[in-house]
Amino acid sequence: MTGAEMIVQVIADEQVGVIFGYSGGAILPTYDAVFRFNQQNRDERDKGKLPLVVPANEQGAGFMAAGYSRATGKVGTVMVTSGPGATNMVTPVRDCAADSVPLVVICGQVPRAAIGTDAFQEAPISAVMGSVAKHVFLVTDPERLEATIRTAFEIARTGRPGPVVVDVPKDVQNWKGTFHGGTRLPIPGYRRRLQRVTERALPESDCQSFLQFLSQAERPLIYAGGGVVNANASDSVRKFADRFGIPVTTTLMGIGAVDTTESLSLHMLGMHGM
């Protein structure tokens, strides 16, 4: 299996549903692998199982993937070429980082031997995206390609969701190796942090104390953010507010968490709020 085919197989395993992107020379092997995958894997309507949506440019692909992620809860997936194709993704990547939208961007890159030589359509995407993405990978060891792509999806969707960029040189895409299935990179520090957050969940005794403090509050207020929407907890927040008669206001990303026509709704706070 080629590196490009491994990328596509991992994307299929992650059940993202749709790929958004705009082709170019440095990502062509992976686009060809998508077409081959769809020829070999048809759904009940005889359509490929990994539809490819091609917009007018890469930035459009990024925002379409972000919208798709918000609407479906799946990780938005984008494939773009090197240089200008990858730099066109900066704005949607930064937008997803700010709004906690899970996104995986697969960028083509010039062959490893040409990196740093100002080759045609080369750009230092790891450096460019490092300040705007949740995490960036540059795949220099093809043996770690499969694990890197799978780990990118893990990082994108866990903890605070966000965009992960994977820069894949063209020769790594053309490399041939063995697909193992299920492999991930050893990122113990990241996984330990997630575990610590999970372990800090309020115990039952503290929940009872919270409810006692709430009953004594003179002017309680619920300030709901985007995490309520991401966690599909909107219904729980509404029931909680109704039960205790607590007004609810939201952040910009929390819009939709509560019905703004209800008497307990205070709409959105902030620069653009009420």
Model-flagged regions — what are they?
Residues 1-274:
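N-terminal alpha/beta PP-like core and its mobile active-site loop of ThDP/TPP-dependent enzymes
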